[in-house]
Swiss-Prot record:
InterPro entries: T_IF-3_C_sf, T_IF-3_N_sf, Translation_initiation_fac3_CS, Translation_initiation_fac_3, Translation_initiation_fac_3_C, Translation_initiation_fac_3_N. It comes from Campylobacter concisus (strain 13826). Keywords: Cytoplasm, Initiation factor, Protein biosynthesis. PROSITE patterns: IF3. This is Translation initiation factor IF-3. NCBIfam families: infC. The keyword Iron does not apply. Monomer.
Length: 172
């Protein structure tokens, strides 16, 4: 366990006086640590330090095992709800044949139907670097073919030797 996530409980708590709260919300007020430990032992629960920076530190009497289980459960739920965005990249060139464009656009539409984002990338070779507008024109041509099933997230942008365009699945 890392230092930041480490929770002090029972005898590990060093403060002499603590503000103690019960698991059911009962406020015991400011009492000595030993007295708080005695109460927690009587109830068969743990004394957990929840606010170490407060004056005096705040402790709660609770079942630590159950508390940790619930925290882990919350983290798993949060992780499940997170959605990872997968970006598929399709590479093109300025001198690509029409049937190859059709093939790559077909693949892109399959990716979009699966809910993936697609990045079209035109690589500029040699003299093509002097006219990057040809790469932009190529991406505009691709956009005309795919605009019915996608939203354009990024307009065609010239980035070094590449011209990039990002499309996302249509919402709704």
């Amino acid at each position: 366990m890392s230092k930041e996530n480490e929770v002090l409980l029972n005898e590990d708590i060093r403060a002499r006086e603590v503000r103690c709260v019960g698991d059911d919300g009962t406020a015991y007020g400011v009492i000595s640590r030993d007295e708080a430990l005695e109460i927690s032992n009587k109830l068969g629960l743990d004394l957990v330090l929840i606010a170490p920076d407060a004056k005096p530190p705040v402790c709660k009497i609770m079942d630590y095992g159950k508390f940790r289980y619930q925290q882990e459960k919350k983290q798993k739920e949060a992780k499940k709800k997170q959605k990872t965005i997968e970006i598929k990249e399709i590479k093109l060139s300025v001198k690509i044949a029409q049937n190859d464009i059709n093939y790559k656009v077909k693949h892109a539409s399959e990716f979009l139907q699966d809910g993936k984002h697609v990045k079209f990338r035109v690589f500029l070779k040699g003299r093509e670097m002097s006219t990057p507008e040809a790469g932009v024109a190529m991406l505009e041509k691709v956009w005309e073919m795919i605009k019915d099933e996608a939203d354009r997230d990024k307009e065609p942008i010239i980035e070094g030797r590449y011209v990039n365009m990002l499309v996302t699945p249509k919402k709704g």
